[in-house]
Structures are given as structure tokens and as C-alpha cells.
């Protein structure tokens, strides 16, 4: 698995398509995490199960910004962070993309 992260609208998907054209892409994975949280499912467990079925996938997830005022939004930020840490740990390679430039960080 390859994990690509970075801020919103920084060119992560274009970078992934250019660098890994043969791989299945899962862009905006933070929205999958949000769905799992809303359904009361553990997003790390759901991600682990997905990776078992798709070990060669490229997962693209935006970093989430400042700490929000609402408690439910803070919970989501925390869960996205936990999933990001899990993905980085499990990934063969990790890239951070800024302004369309990917930097390998693992």
C-alpha cells in the first residue's frame, strides 16, 4: 500500500495518477473515515479490513486543519489522525504532497 497525504487541493490525486498509473486509487479517504465514525464503526478496523482485500491500493487522504469548536468535529479530526498514523505505519511508501510536488517521507 502507498499512502499519500497533504493539505486540501495540493495536487495529491494528480501526483498519484502520474506516479502510480497502474494502481487503484482511493482519493479523499478522510470521507470514508467520517462515514465509519458516523456509522459507529472503528475506522482503523475498517481500514485494516479494506487493506486486506486491496493490499496494493494507493490511499490519498487530506490533512485536517485546526481544532474545531464542535465536539463531534474534534472526534472526527482525532479519528482521521489515528487512521493516518495507522496508514503511515502500514504503508510501504508514504508521500506528502504540497503544491503538486510529492516528497517521499517513508
Model-inferred region functions:
Residues 1-24:
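Glycine-rich P-loop/Walker A and Walker A-like loops and their local beta1-loop-alpha1 context
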Residues 2, 33-37, 66-69:
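Short, basic, glycine/proline-bearing loop/turn elements
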Residues 3, 25-27, 58-60:
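Structural motif
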Residues 6, 28, 99:
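Active-site donor-binding loop signature of nucleotide-sugar glycosyltransferases
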Residues 10-11, 32, 102:
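Glycine-rich nucleotide phosphate-binding loop and flanking beta-alpha elements
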Residues 17-41:
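Conserved substrate/cofactor phosphate-moiety recognition/catalytic segment
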Amino acid at each position: 500500500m502507498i499512502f499519500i497525504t497533504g493539505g486540501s487541493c495540493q495536487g495529491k490525486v494528480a501526483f498519484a495518477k502520474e506516479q502510480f498509473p497502474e494502481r487503484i486509487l482511493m482519493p479523499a479517504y478522510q470521507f470514508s473515515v467520517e462515514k465509519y465514525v458516523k456509522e459507529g464503526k472503528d475506522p482503523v478496523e475498517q481500514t485494516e479490513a479494506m487493506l486486506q482485500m486491496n493490499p496494493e491500493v494507493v490511499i490519498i487522504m487530506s490533512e485536517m486543519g485546526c481544532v474545531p469548536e464542535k465536539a463531534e468535529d474534534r472526534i472526527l479530526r482525532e479519528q482521521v489522525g489515528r487512521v493516518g498514523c495507522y496508514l503511515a505505519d502500514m504503508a510501504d511508501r508514504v508521500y506528502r504532497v504540497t503544491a503538486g510536488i510529492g516528497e517521499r517521507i517513508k
